[in-house]
């Protein structure tokens, strides 16, 4: 699919689409001659007063095939994804860009064509395109179809490991390699693993995997979440992140925000003031520059 998509949208769907985009974290604006425009880091979706809808950006294909057509337009005219039914392990993570909360890495081993076909039929896609409220039910479906493994590093453990690795990509490589080692059959045979290439060099993850297993093929690619098994892993990782955030909120009686925005920084200042540095360190990733900025403002 090209990096743009044009269709016609019924006025009755305007508010539904806008509401769904807001739930997905899109930034909403109203440029001239439009009903509204939603923007994310990878795609823009513009609805004009005429009813024309224009989607643009590198994330167009995923957005249209996995969200706009099945959930809003309820058509499937452009969905031409050829199903890859080879047995494989998909790995993905959630939380690495969030100041609060854990780093969660998940793996899914789809061991049969039947399991993979079921994932396609469940409309599994990258968790970033799915509202949080839908993540739980999808995760339950995935667990009923495939072998799964999740590693959740709560902030206290994460911060200790980061101090040891001194590099986020090295830490990610370790969690990914551990997941692959746990899920891969012995011997691996024709089963392979697929992951997003999160480091500038493929060697980072490859070396971590080879320390544990020498018999499994590893495929790394940018935007690996387009693969249905990796997308399934992204959903499990997101579910683990969301449930862990809720657990931390309950344990420390605080409200945590996602991301690393100015609002997140302000919330960190409030936690520091109300609960103290010890609690702040137990709910955040201390290598983020936000942490030192918050401590500095607290000492003024």
Swiss-Prot record:
<protein>
    <recommendedName>
        <fullName>Ribonuclease HIII</fullName>
        <ecNumber>3.1.26.4</ecNumber>
    </recommendedName>
</protein>
<keyword id="KW-0255">Endonuclease</keyword>
<dbReference type="GO" id="GO:0004523">
    <property type="term" value="F:RNA-DNA hybrid ribonuclease activity"/>
</dbReference>
<dbReference type="InterPro" id="IPR036397">
    <property type="entry name" value="RNaseH_sf"/>
</dbReference>
<dbReference type="GO" id="GO:0006298">
    <property type="term" value="P:mismatch repair"/>
</dbReference>
<comment type="similarity">
    <text>Belongs to the RNase HII family. RnhC subfamily.</text>
</comment>
<dbReference type="Pfam" id="PF01351">
    <property type="entry name" value="RNase_HII"/>
</dbReference>
<dbReference type="InterPro" id="IPR012337">
    <property type="entry name" value="RNaseH-like_sf"/>
</dbReference>
<dbReference type="InterPro" id="IPR024568">
    <property type="entry name" value="RNase_HIII_N"/>
</dbReference>
<keyword id="KW-0963">Cytoplasm</keyword>
<comment type="function">
    <text>Endonuclease that specifically degrades the RNA of RNA-DNA hybrids.</text>
</comment>
<dbReference type="GO" id="GO:0003723">
    <property type="term" value="F:RNA binding"/>
</dbReference>
<keyword id="KW-0378">Hydrolase</keyword>
<feature type="binding site">
    <location>
        <position position="196"/>
    </location>
    <ligand>
        <name>a divalent metal cation</name>
    </ligand>
</feature>
<dbReference type="InterPro" id="IPR024567">
    <property type="entry name" value="RNase_HII/HIII_dom"/>
</dbReference>
<feature type="binding site">
    <location>
        <position position="93"/>
    </location>
    <ligand>
        <name>a divalent metal cation</name>
    </ligand>
</feature>
<dbReference type="Pfam" id="PF11858">
    <property type="entry name" value="DUF3378"/>
</dbReference>
<keyword id="KW-0460">Magnesium</keyword>
<feature type="binding site">
    <location>
        <position position="92"/>
    </location>
    <ligand>
        <name>a divalent metal cation</name>
    </ligand>
</feature>
<dbReference type="InterPro" id="IPR004641">
    <property type="entry name" value="RNase_HIII"/>
</dbReference>
<dbReference type="GO" id="GO:0032299">
    <property type="term" value="C:ribonuclease H2 complex"/>
</dbReference>
<dbReference type="GO" id="GO:0005737">
    <property type="term" value="C:cytoplasm"/>
</dbReference>
<keyword id="KW-0479">Metal-binding</keyword>
<dbReference type="InterPro" id="IPR001352">
    <property type="entry name" value="RNase_HII/HIII"/>
</dbReference>
<dbReference type="InterPro" id="IPR012295">
    <property type="entry name" value="TBP_dom_sf"/>
</dbReference>
<keyword id="KW-0540">Nuclease</keyword>
<dbReference type="GO" id="GO:0000287">
    <property type="term" value="F:magnesium ion binding"/>
</dbReference>
<feature type="domain" description="RNase H type-2">
    <location>
        <begin position="86"/>
        <end position="300"/>
    </location>
</feature>
<dbReference type="GO" id="GO:0043137">
    <property type="term" value="P:DNA replication, removal of RNA primer"/>
</dbReference>
